[in-house]
Amino acid sequence: VVTKCPTTLSEAEQIQIKQKLRRLSKLNQAVYFTFVSYSSAVNSKKGSLPVVQIQQSNCLLLAGIAKPTSFFNYLKNSETICLTYPDHHHFTDSDIQSIKEQAGDKLIVTTEKDYVRLKDSVLQEQLYYLPIQTSFISASDHFDATILSFIEQEFQK
């Protein structure tokens, strides 16, 4: 599965990638392409807000993921503060205090992954997360059928 593809990945580009992968792996595996899409609302313990409201407000965006650019680009405006931490960052009390100071009374929007780490901190009243979804560019039915077939074969052993 080739992940985080642009939604505009053409059939010709998919074929090129498949050919290159097959040359490198010397296997004739099925290859699938997925993309990430963002929700139209951010969520918190208190409820949801439309992304449009976040895009038009002065908030703090926080990401501790490997490549946060698309997350920031989806939500930010010229007033937005963007904070980046390393992937899988363990937020210390000092980190949380620094985030709180930089945010002031602004909303804080983070990734689902970081929300899990921060939801019970002093940030919880102003903390929201942006849900993501992984979708197949094409052939999702074939992928599902392949997985189900494999599982059925394994249980018959």
Q: What function would you assign to each model-found segment?
A:
Residues V1-L107:
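C-terminal accessory "lid"/substrate-recognition subdomains
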Residues T7-L9, Y115-V116, S135-I137:
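Short acidic, S/G/P-rich loop/turn micro-motifs used as interaction or catalytic elements
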Residues A12-Q16, V122, H142:
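Generic recognition of short, well-ordered alpha-helical segments
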Residues I65-P68, T111-R117:
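Short, polar loop motifs at secondary-structure junctions
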Residues P68, Q97, S135, F155-K157:
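Nucleotide-activated sugar donor-binding and catalytic core shared by glycosyltransferases
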Residues L75, R117-E125:
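Short loop/helix-cap segments at secondary-structure boundaries that form the rim of catalytic
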Residues C82, L107-E112, Y128-P131:
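Conserved active-site loop/cleft motifs that coordinate metal ions or position small ligands
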Residues P86-D87, L123-E154:
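Short, flexible loop segments at boundaries between secondary-structure elements
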